[in-house]
């Protein structure tokens, strides 16, 4: 998910019963540079359901349990400044965490890229990943992660050889 989509989640968007997150809105910045919740996402294809993994589920449960009241009914909200959390805030916080841990930071969007890379490496079909990422078409996914697919060429040939030997 994009950071703006995560920051715009409402409790009803997290469907623990069916194990999905309904992505329906995002955080945008107005002409006055203030963040606000925008119904809809970056693209039409951004409106989607993303499955909740077993590892993510307990964190979402905790976020829902700890949620306080706020004017926008968001799962993640800046209660200290009484405002919507924007991507710049998340980037600053992420860079601070990386600095404290003495690891290089490439911005929080790198987490999305790493997630997609690990999905590809684990064998998740590109057409499924396209939907999870909210890409308009498969070419966006394939073009963005070309380097990952190229690294998997030899593995694919080895799989094919094993299959052919069994036939």
Outline where the language-model segments fall.
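Catalytic-site neighborhood detector that most strongly recognizes the C-terminal catalytic loop/helix
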Residues: 27, 133-158
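Short, basic (Lys/Arg/His-rich) helix/loop patches that form interaction surfaces
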Residues: 50, 66-74, 79-84, 88-135, ...
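Gram-positive cell-envelope targeting signals
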Residues: 3-8, 90, 106, 110, ...
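Short, cationic motifs built from Arg/Lys/His that form the positively charged side of catalytic pockets
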Residues: 1-3, 48-49, 63, 112
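C-terminal secondary-structure termini that scaffold catalytic or DNA-interacting sites
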Residues: 13, 18, 29-31, 36-47, ...
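Residue-level detector of conserved, well-ordered beta-strand and adjacent loop positions
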Residues: 24, 53, 77-79, 146
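Short, charged phosphate-coordinating catalytic segments
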Residues: 1-27
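A short, basic/aromatic helix-end/turn motif that makes direct DNA contacts
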Residues: 8-14, 130-136, 146
């Amino acid at each position: 998910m994009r950071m703006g989509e995560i920051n715009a989640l409402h409790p009803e968007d997290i469907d623990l019963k069916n194990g999905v997150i309904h992505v329906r809105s995002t955080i945008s910045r107005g002409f006055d540079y203030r963040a606000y919740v925008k119904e809809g996402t970056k693209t039409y294809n951004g409106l989607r359901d993303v499955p909740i993994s077993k590892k993510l589920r307990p964190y979402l449960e905790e976020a829902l349990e700890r949620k306080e009241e706020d004017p926008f009914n968001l799962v993640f909200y800046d209660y200290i400044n009484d405002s919507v959390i924007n991507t710049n805030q998340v980037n600053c916080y992420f860079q601070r965490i990386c600095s404290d841990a003495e690891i290089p930071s490439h911005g929080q969007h790198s987490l999305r890229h790493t997630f997609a890379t690990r999905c590809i490496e684990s064998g998740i079909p590109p057409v499924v990943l396209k939907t999870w990422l909210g890409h308009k078409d498969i070419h966006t996914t394939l073009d963005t992660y070309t380097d990952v697919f190229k690294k998997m060429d030899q593995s694919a040939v080895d799989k094919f050889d094993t299959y052919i030997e069994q036939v």
